[in-house]
Regions:
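Nucleotide-activated sugar donor-binding and catalytic core shared by glycosyltransferases
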Residues: 1-178
Length: 178
């Protein structure tokens, strides 16, 4: 029913056929974890828009000697871009586009900082705590504020019609708030 509400228009007939997130297994909770995952987005413009926030988080982790490594799962065409952007990070960072290895690393993730989108569903399905972030350009945010009826950016918050997953988005996304 969720899809019908948002994607079924009088002149366009739509059918929901499933999503790969349903095949993801919930991870087993444990006492010690090795990673904080950074899900930077699946498009280069998302990475460019959000990278400074991830960079500040890495600086916080390294300067406060927080005992976690960073795991960045990504797509093959983004690996070199991310490696270049993270080249000066002091925190041990593992960047991978090898989907077969993701579950191994996700099993060891303490918390995820997740770009809003399908990734938030994948992290939630794995039972990993997360904070969702996103930033529209200022003009787009102003226009959409009056046109869009949903209050949240995270898909799970939209579906449930309440804040389940913490999110810091748009004008609320500042280094201080994050």
């Amino acid at each position: 029913d969720f899809e019908k509400k948002y994607f079924n228009y009088p002149i366009i007939n739509t059918t929901f056929i499933g999503h790969p997130v349903f095949h993801i297994k919930k991870r087993i909770k444990k006492n010690n974890y090795k990673y904080i995952s950074f899900l930077l987005g699946s498009r280069e413009n998302e990475i460019n828009k959000l990278f400074d926030y991830f960079d500040k988080l890495e600086q916080y982790i390294s300067s406060n000697k927080i005992n976690y490594h960073i795991f960045i799962p990504t797509l093959p065409h983004l690996v070199d871009i991310i490696k270049f952007r993270t080249r000066n990070w002091k925190t041990v960072t593992f960047i991978s586009s090898e989907i077969d290895l993701f579950d191994k690393y996700y099993d060891d993730v303490f918390i995820s900082i997740t770009c809003s989108g399908t990734a938030s569903l994948e992290i939630a399905k794995r039972n990993i705590p997360q904070v969702v972030i996103y930033k529209l350009n200022f003009t787009t945010e102003l226009i959409l504020r009056h046109l869009v009826k949903v209050k949240n950016a995270c898909l799970l918050n939209i579906i449930s019609e309440k804040m389940i997953i913490p999110e810091v988005v748009n004008s609320q996304l500042t280094n201080r708030n994050l």
